[in-house]
Amino acid sequence: MWFNPRMSKNFRVVALIGKYQSPEVAEAVLRIAEFLRVRGLDVWIEQGTASSIGMAGQFAVASYEEIGAQADLAVVLGGDGTMLNTARRLSQHGVPLVGINQGRLGFLTDISRDEALPKLGEILEGRYTEESRAMLDAEVLRAGHRVFQTLALNDVVINKGDLGRMIEFDLSIDGEFVYTQRSDGMILATPTGSTAYALSANGPILHPNVGGIALVPLCPHALTARPVTLPDTSHIEIVLLPQHDARIHFDGQARFDARAGDRLRVTRSPDVVRLLHPQGYSYFAMLREKLHWSATPRRP
């Protein structure tokens, strides 16, 4: 295979991060690792990935902290869930991410497994488009003390707890009371998360370049409670009212069990996720494909 020795000059250390316990990902990780090694790159396998797919000893193994500190590029193999987890762990380090789709929809992992090697080759040669995705910084306060904090790339969701009944909460924005809502919960979504859970709850699609946070009620008791898009400079606070418990989910991966009186505070994080796409990537083409826009109804 032809190789340009000037390629990859900006990517010397490449980390591979794969979905755990997936035979298909194991094969893809090995194939891509060999592809990168032939090009003279230092290949690191994230330690959980290496352990899960049995590659320890074949390549250098590194923790997320080591990848964040020293890797020039991280290639994520899996679905959007794997990318969300990786993004939260590496965003503070500024490591650019490339997504190889081994899952289903793949809004974030936009390179198909069949095109992985040629598309990676293009990116290593510098032929790519880079974009930054906003994240949310969320914290929970109890009796004035912070008891939980994390980041989210997609969304923060507060919803009903074990009893399965509606919850009631106060919503304030920038210190101003907005309303008291009774509902199954609320989704706070980034532009990236606007095509996830928020979309299925009739929320708006926000272009990634829009500086906004979507508030999408879940089955509100008042039918006039509609989705609202706020500037991403907003400070959002939700206070869970008495006699209600709730669960708060972050990107559908981390969870916190909230009690009455707990305060959920959400702002835009100063950290961003750097995504690299092959040349020719189009956000609207991606939506058209994933959401089946322009599809012609067919008779059975």
UniProtKB/Swiss-Prot annotation:
Top-level EC class as recorded in UniProt? transferase
The main location class comes to cytoplasm
Q: Does the keyword NAD apply?
A: yes
Requisite cofactors: a divalent metal cation
Which cell locations does it reside in? Cytoplasm
Enzyme nomenclature, EC number: 2.7.1.23
Active site residues per record? D80 (proton acceptor)
Q: Which residues bind NAD(+)?
A: D80, G81, N154, D155, R165, R182, D184, T195, A196, Y197, A198, L199, S200, Q253
| Origin superkingdom | Bacteria
InterPro entries cross-referenced by the UniProt entry = ATP-NAD_kinase_N, ATP-NAD_kinase_PpnK-typ_C, NAD/diacylglycerol_kinase_sf, NADK
Query: Is Repeat included in the keywords of this UniProt record?
Result: no
Q: One GO cellular component from the entry?
A: cytoplasm
Q: Which GO terms describe its molecular function?
A: ATP binding; metal ion binding; NAD binding; NAD+ kinase activity
Q: Which keywords are on file for this protein?
A: ATP-binding, Cytoplasm, Kinase, NAD, NADP, Nucleotide-binding, Transferase
Q: Which GO terms describe its biological process?
A: NAD metabolic process; NADP biosynthetic process
The protein's matches in Gene3D superfamilies, at most eight in alphabetical order, are given as: Probable inorganic polyphosphate/atp-NAD kinase, domain 1, Probable inorganic polyphosphate/atp-NAD kinase, domain 2
Q: Which reaction does it catalyse?
A: NAD(+) + ATP = ADP + NADP(+) + H(+)
**Function (record text):** Involved in the regulation of the intracellular balance of NAD and NADP, and is a key enzyme in the biosynthesis of NADP. Catalyzes specifically the phosphorylation on 2'-hydroxyl of the adenosine moiety of NAD to yield NADP.
Entry similarity comment: Belongs to the NAD kinase family.
Task: List, alphabetically, the NCBIfam families matched.
Answer: PRK01231.1, PRK02155.1
The cross-references to HAMAP family, in alphabetical order and at most eight, read: NAD_kinase (MF_00361)
| Entry protein name | NAD kinase
